[in-house]
A protein has these predicted regions:
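A glycine- and small-aliphatic-rich helix-loop capping segment at beta-alpha/alpha-beta transitions
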Residues: 127-139
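C-terminal catalytic domains of large/alpha subunits in multi-subunit enzymes
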Residues: 1-9, 13, 64-83, 95-98, ...
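Short helix/loop capping segments that flank catalytic or ligand/cofactor-binding pockets
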Residues: 59, 122, 259-261
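Conserved beta-alpha junction segments in alpha/beta enzyme cores
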Residues: 19-38, 79-110, 117
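Glycine/serine-rich anion-binding loops at beta->alpha junctions
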Residues: 114-127
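Glycine-rich, histidine-containing beta strand-loop boundary motifs that form or position
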Residues: 44, 52-53, 115, 149-151
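Flexible, low-hydrophobicity surface segments
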Residues: 1-77, 130, 159-160
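Short, surface-exposed beta-strand-loop junctions and turns on beta-sheet-rich folds
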Residues: 55-58, 119, 182, 256
Length: 352
């Protein structure tokens, strides 16, 4: 299990634990490890936190009306750059949709538990509000406090992948317009130095460049679209992946150093393929003119059900090098292959 946990930590970019306890439902998430005498805090309707003796009391004090999904169609928030391009693409707002919502607990004058715990959310929880809330409230009430977000809270308050609108040519040159986000320009230029990046201010939720392959994936996908083929995708980490896609199968090849545990590596690659296929074909969030997300339930994110996915086959190429992340390259390769297979339509999601 040591090597399995190490591979999981590399792919999830946070400390992960794989053991019998996990299979038995004791995964070690922050909420699972909180002391029994914790107060519970949840976001309230005014931008603060409601605190109660248990989750039910805290939610009753929050005075929030449960959100729903909207019937209003999602619209890509950024316009394409002018010019003649071999490939163009506009992406939409999407929800990271991680399994375990944000939580952290803290003792008075202590350090908060990490919301990453045993689930890294592929970078989406790195800027979570929960740890600082738990710390400040524990110091205020002089009792341990568990700060926990509902699914709706995570959608409203959590950072999103920066939407882009770009055009590129076969020679590798082009323009990508992207929601202004710290670190996003360097992420794009790390794989596409000939692409000019224009950051734009748009109304919407917070964005983050720490979310899985943000920026550099979109740049490589656009370049693949311009060439009309995927070839081999190289990640900034140095891993490589290729993918072939049709309605029935997604075939993947990945090289990412010593596998450590092929079962774990394969599972992360299958998950990355699912995330990529779903992102390209089905996912979106409606954001209103005030920048508020209107799709607030799990079923409104557009995530493709696992049973509706093409079959995913993973070939792990032999490699005795240093173990590095491979699933981000797989994510990018499958997204590019899916887009090309579906006809490189200019706006995502393209539909199934």
């Amino acid at each position: 299990t040591k090597e399995a946990s190490r591979r999981a930590s590399i792919e999830g970019r946070s400390n992960q634990k794989i053991a019998l306890d996990t299979a038995l439902g004791r995964g070690g998430f922050s909420a699972d490890t909180a002391p029994s005498n914790c107060l519970v805090a949840v976001p309230d309707s005014s931008g603060g936190w409601s605190v109660g003796e248990d989750l039910n009391e805290a939610r009753n004090l929050s005075n929030k009306i449960q959100g729903r999904r909207t019937t209003v169609k999602a619209v890509s928030p950024i316009e394409l750059p002018p010019g003649e391009w071999d490939a163009v693409l506009k992406t939409n707002w999407v929800e990271p949709g991680y399994l375990e919502t944000d939580s952290a607990w803290c003792e008075p004058d202590g350090e908060p538990s990490t919301p990453l715990a045993n689930g890294g959310a592929f970078g989406s929880k790195l800027e979570s509000l929960a740890p600082e809330a738990a710390r400040s409230l524990a110091n205020k009430y002089r009792r341990p406090v568990l700060a926990i977000l509902s699914r709706e809270d995570s959608v409203r308050l959590g950072p999103k992948r920066p939407p882009i609108a770009g055009g590129v040519n076969k020679n590798g040159k082009g323009i990508i317009r992207v929601a202004r986000t710290p670190g996003i320009v360097s992420a794009i230029n790390s794989v596409a130095p000939e692409i000019e990046v224009e950051e734009v201010d748009i109304s919407g939720p917070a964005t983050s460049s720490t979310i899985r392959a943000a920026g550099w994936a979109e740049a490589q996908i656009l370049l693949c679209g311009a060439l009309g083929k995927v070839g081999t995708i190289y990640s900034p980490d140095g891993s490589s992946a290729s993918a072939q896609v049709d309605e029935k199968q997604i075939n993947i090849s990945v090289r990412c150093g010593l596998p450590l545990n092929e079962t774990v590596l394969r599972s992360y690659c299958i998950g990355a393929a699912h995330m990529a296929w779903s992102w390209v074909t089905s996912e979106s969030l409606t954001v209103d003119e005030n920048g508020e997300v209107q799709d607030l339930t799990v079923r409104s994110f557009g995530i493709v059900r696992a049973g509706e996915m093409p079959e995913v086959n993973v070939e792990i190429e032999p490699d005795k090098g240093k173990p590095i992340n491979g699933s981000d390259a797989v994510f990018t390769a499958v997204a590019a292959a899916t887009w090309i297979y579906k006809g490189t339509l200019p706006e995502w999601p393209i539909g199934r």
